[in-house]
Amino acid sequence: MAKLVECVPNFSEGCNKEVIEALGRAISQTPGCTLLDVDAGASTNRTVYTFVGTPEAVVEGALSAARMAWELIDMSRHKGEHPRMGALDVCPFVPVMNISMEECVICAHVFGQRLSEELGVPVYLYGEAARQESRRTLPAIRAGEYEALPKKLEKPEWVPDFGPPAFVPQWGATVTGARTFLIAYNINLLCTKELAHRIALNIREQGRGADQPGSLKKVQGIGWYLEEENIAQVSTNLLDFETTPLHAVYEEVCYNAEALKLPVVGSQLVGLVPKKAMLDAAEFYIKKEKLFILEEEHKIKLVVSRLGLDSLSPFNPRERIIEYLVQAGQEDKGLVTKPLGAFVRAVGGRSAAPGGGSVAATAASLGAALGCMVGLMSYGKRQFEQLDSIMRNVIPPLHQAMDELVAMVDADSRAFSSYMEAMKLPKSTPEERERRVVAMQQGLKTAVEVPCTLAVKVNNLWSSLKMLAHHGNLACKSDLQVGAKMLEAAVFGAYFNVMINLKDITDEKFKTETSQMVTRLLEEAKQGSALVLALLEKREA
């Protein structure tokens, strides 16, 4: 699969529609770049562009937009609520799919060097690309903003990483770097700018200084007034949403606002958000309110409602969640997108993949789906009211496994294909032969790891199936019996696929450990299936 990098350039223009559109065209017309989002703010006088592409393409896209900004933006006239120091204020590169942080650091270095050479402007590196610890954070570099640059550039400690230590009034300076996914998130309040900033100081990690740190790690914050909406905002950057998630920021602002007797009236996501950040927030509110929600779409709706993400403008998940946008922009050629008949014919075709591994994953997903169905058929009606708490615990792991196991249909096929591709590598020289052998061995190990993972996922479901066998709707008895045997058959399939690939692996320790593990997993599946079937046989209608 192609490497995918996200680039999020922030330009200091949020009012002039012609300039905003011209910068967007410069990006979207760059080969290999897909422009996902344009978020312009009049009060901040700033526009955030989000686009994705290969490492090479996103560097070219960012440079194209920078060249256009050089022609259209004059920083000497810029005014806005948001801190800034340049026409292209900041340009981070973010790993999205099949790419490392180190590769994004290279993107930042290449971009910074080329930008400084072409335009003759100072460029600083931050985040994971920083060459100095004092420049890791954006606020540290941007301190004093554009107005402080003339004197700042004269100081030895502020010599740019690229370009001349000279003030360019038209441009200012640019910061580029590599970082994890940053979420720009604002909470709306009916109050003054000063009160919003007071809350921002309470929650941001920096707080009011070293002796008064804030309550939330990896969070930057500032208070401002949004003139076009006539509200104040606590504007935050979540530098690591795994450390401090969306809902934690919202709840902390609400807590502080309540103490000050201030109303919170929803919130706003600027730009795009990872799906995981939304689902983590959903799980928080599901647990907090003891809700029962299975479908991803419904979980997203819950978060939009609880955080008030549609308070200022409609929130369309298909346009705001990066995974949905990336999927929409790519042609999906996976096996699971095929009609059932086409998938069966693909299995029956004259090629090694899809084969037994994909069929085993299909069986596993269908087994989990049948278990999920039986659970749902035993829930939500008055006659099953006494089973409510049991089914709320039993159904979610089956529903989750159903989705995860479907994805493994393609994962198995891809894993085997990587081995087949390695076999085609050139072998004319000793070096080429060595590379080919290493690639083939890695391909075989990957081909083994996928069915092992499948077997583990299946065996995690037996406790749920046992509960269904005890308590589930007896009208669905045969469905649960079929589901149990499908899951058992899937582990048999995983076992056979592992064993046939192990024989060609030269790592004896890996072979022994994997063989023992998959044999144990097969025995566990046999016992789990037998117990479920025995429990069902004892029950009478």
From Swiss-Prot:
Region (Formiminotransferase C-subdomain): 182-326
Top-rank taxon, per record: Eukaryota
Sequence segments annotated as region (Cyclodeaminase/cyclohydrolase): 335-541
EC number: 2.1.2.5, 4.3.1.4
Residue numbers binding folate: G163, P164, P165, A166, F167, V168, P169, Q170, W171, G172
One BP term from GO: L-histidine catabolic process to glutamate and formate
Region described as Linker: 327-334
UniProt subcellular location: Cytoplasm, Cytosol; Golgi apparatus; Cytoplasm, Cytoskeleton, Microtubule organizing center, Centrosome, Centriole
Spans traversing the lipid bilayer: none
Pathway: Amino-acid degradation; L-histidine degradation into L-glutamate; L-glutamate from N-formimidoyl-L-glutamate (transferase route): step 1/1
Gene Ontology terms, MF aspect: folic acid binding; formimidoyltetrahydrofolate cyclodeaminase activity; glutamate formimidoyltransferase activity
Keyword Lyase: yes
Cellular-component GO terms for this entry: centriole; cytosol; Golgi apparatus
Assembly description: Homooctamer, including four polyglutamate binding sites. The subunits are arranged as a tetramer of dimers, and form a planar ring-shaped structure.
Protein name (record): Formimidoyltransferase-cyclodeaminase
Native organism: Gallus gallus
Taxonomic lineage: Eukaryota, Metazoa, Chordata, Craniata, Vertebrata
Gene: FTCD
